[in-house]
Each structure stands twice: as structure tokens, then as C-alpha cells.
């Protein structure tokens, strides 16, 4: 049974013993945000860096600024969107996407660490990350950008205070600290919710769809553990007015789980899915079809890539 207060005290002590001057990689998800807040309690020099990769949702940067301010986090926000998106050009393989993003993250952090004089990199890696990335004797299911995307030789000492926690435990500690509860968001961001090549046009489509899914899902009394749209490289025939269309397809993923290691597709109120579909096809002209993913984990992973 996890004791949040003890875990926080132990983590602060661990950080103080292992980090003299460090840089913390904050993706904006629950894991790295929790680590940023815990690290701010340590009596050591830590700079929390949030990178605008260009692969974020519409309100991510605003939310992070508010958390940095509310919890006195020594934070910095860097705009590196052009760099990330340019490196993903013509890349369609999901593993390659993750590794490119991971390597680019490390490059940016090493540069910032050098400027800051840091010798350590703190990351919000948790147990499912290194298990799925082939930790121990397990096969790699998929590389997580903060595990499988790391270069073999890195100029920073890696420190991972949360690596033995599971998702439900992260949420428990976050609640104890009064952090706003947010659904999990992958480190590689929207890049792995676009099947195929990532482009600015596709990112803009997916951001609009994400806003709709998150707003309509907020009306549910019992929200799924995770809920998001995926942009598919599939065009289908449709009708708009009396005109034929040949538009793109959005898949909706609602998943229920306790720890992120296994889960089942959610069965939300049908009217919510109907509203999501109607709004997406009405408000996003590039989309003319919405489908619902009814696959559990396993055999599928939560994210499509």
C-alpha cells in the first residue's frame, strides 16, 4: 500500500542525495508534472524545462505555466517546434518517430543542461514505460521516448525517482499534493496519434478534434481513464450537402484501466459519442467519418502507435 507522504519524503531525500545541479524534463503529463513539483521541494538546484515540440494540444502550455506558478517550480518553456516537426518529415514508422523525438529531446536538454551547468537529467519515467520499452528480460512492445529513445551515450546522469510507480499510484500522490488530475498524455505528443507522416495540417486537424473530444467527454459523470482521437491515413466517400466528399477518418479511443498495464475499451453514454461524431464532421471539413475503437489492452496498446 503506497503512503503518499512517505513516498514524497523519500523522493525528496533521494533527489537531494543524487542531484547537485540538474535539469528536469517536463512533458506536461501527470508523471513529469508530479516529478517537477516533488523536485521543487528538494534543497538542490533543479531547472524544470518544458519543450514546445509543436506536437502539443491547444491548452498544454497555458496549463504548465499555471502549475509552475502555483507550485513555485523553477521552470523554463522553450519553443523548439520547428526543430521537432522538421525532423519528423517523411517519417511514417512509429518506432522511428518515437526514437527521433527521444533523441531530439535529449539534444535540447543537453544543450540547456550545459548552459545551466547541470550534470543530471531527471525524468518522470514510471514502471509501464520501462516494462514496455524492454526493461529487464522483456521484449520491447514499443519504445517510450523517455526510455527507448535515449542514446546509448549521454552526457547527463539519468535520475528517475518515479520509476517504480504505476499510473494509479502517480494519481494517488498527485491527489495528495492537490495537483489537478489530467488524463495521461504521451511524451511524443500528437505525433503518435497521427498514423503516418506528421504535418502541420494534420496536427491542426487533430488539435481541433482533441478539443471536441475532451470537451464532450467532460460531460460524463464517470470519465474514462483516457480519451482521445487518432487521425487515420484513411479516406472514405461521404456527402456534404449534395456534394460528394472524400475525407479523412478520425478514430475515437476511450479506455478504462487501473494501472495502465492492461485495460478495456470504455462504454460511455451513446449520446456523448454521437455528439463527438456530429461536431467533428460538422466543424472539421477535412473529416467525413468517425469510428470508435472497441479493442482492449491487450491485444492492443492504449495508444495506436
From Swiss-Prot:
Keywords: ATP-binding, GMP biosynthesis, Ligase, Nucleotide-binding, Purine biosynthesis. GO terms for cellular component: cytosol. Its EC number is 6.3.5.2. InterPro entries: GMP_synth_C (IPR001674), GMP_synthase_B (IPR026598), GMPS_ATP_PPase_dom (IPR025777), Rossmann-like_a/b/a_fold (IPR014729). One of its GO terms (molecular function) is ATP binding. Residues 1-186 form the GMPS ATP-PPase domain. ATP binds at residues 27-33. It catalyses: XMP + L-glutamine + ATP + H2O = GMP + L-glutamate + AMP + diphosphate + 2 H(+). Signal peptide: none annotated. Pathway: Purine metabolism; GMP biosynthesis; GMP from XMP (L-Gln route): step 1/1. Heterodimer composed of a glutamine amidotransferase subunit (A) and a GMP-binding subunit (B). NCBIfam families: guaA_Cterm. HAMAP family: GMP_synthase_B. Catalyzes the synthesis of GMP from XMP. This is GMP synthase [glutamine-hydrolyzing] subunit B. It comes from Picrophilus torridus (strain ATCC 700027 / DSM 9790 / JCM 10055 / NBRC 100828 / KAW 2/3). The gene is guaAB.
